[in-house]
Amino acid sequence: MTTFLGNPVTFTGKQLQVGDIAKDFLLIATDLSQKSLKDFEGKKKVISVVPSIDTGICSKQTRTFNEELSELDNTVVITVSMDLPFAQKRWCSAEGLDNVILLSDFYDHSFGQEYALLMNEWHLLTRAVLILDEHNKVTYTEYVDNVNSDVDYEAAINAAKILP
């Protein structure tokens, strides 16, 4: 059971499992352009999912994965939240991070629904990490049980680094 602020939450959709092929998504970038998995075709993808970039844990998660993994060959680190693209852009500017890929699911929540990440009670995304290979095959997942806690950074970073 997943909890947020001590209360149980429910999700729509089916959580991704290792071995699944991730379905395409359509998210909004900080420049208001639309982005899909096709935009990152042929690259390994670390998808860091957070409820809101403006919280301490979410900020830490975004910064940690970008600092630890953005230099990996043929790899992109993508952070997805429900924040408006304007707030995401403001956060990047305030944090001095220019190369962070922040995408928003605010428009229709389809990413959260398809990947079983949308907390129905809050209309926010849960905390998770999804790692996909160049062919969008899922190689690692972590959906946290307590949204107010950190992901297992060490496990996720190691999983990303061992991808061939």
Swiss-Prot record:
The active site is a conserved redox-active cysteine residue, the peroxidatic cysteine (C(P)), which makes the nucleophilic attack on the peroxide substrate. The peroxide oxidizes the C(P)-SH to cysteine sulfenic acid (C(P)-SOH), which then reacts with another cysteine residue, the resolving cysteine (C(R)), to form a disulfide bridge. The disulfide is subsequently reduced by an appropriate electron donor to complete the catalytic cycle. In this atypical 2-Cys peroxiredoxin, C(R) is present in the same subunit to form an intramolecular disulfide. GO terms for molecular function: thioredoxin peroxidase activity. This is Thiol peroxidase. Keywords: Antioxidant, Disulfide bond, Oxidoreductase, Peroxidase, Redox-active center. The active site is at residue 58. Thiol-specific peroxidase that catalyzes the reduction of hydrogen peroxide and organic hydroperoxides to water and alcohols, respectively. Plays a role in cell protection against oxidative stress by detoxifying peroxides. It catalyses: a hydroperoxide + [thioredoxin]-dithiol = an alcohol + [thioredoxin]-disulfide + H2O. PANTHER family: THIOL PEROXIDASE. Homodimer. Disulfide bonds join 58-92. SUPFAM superfamilies: Thioredoxin-like. It comes from Streptococcus agalactiae serotype V (strain ATCC BAA-611 / 2603 V/R). Transmembrane segments: none annotated. Pfam families: Redoxin (PF08534). Belongs to the peroxiredoxin family. Tpx subfamily. PROSITE patterns: THIOREDOXIN_2, TPX. It comes from the Bacteria. Residues 16-162 form the Thioredoxin domain. Its EC number is 1.11.1.24. Gene3D superfamilies: Glutaredoxin (3.40.30.10). It is an enzyme of class 1 (oxidoreductase). Coiled coil: none annotated.
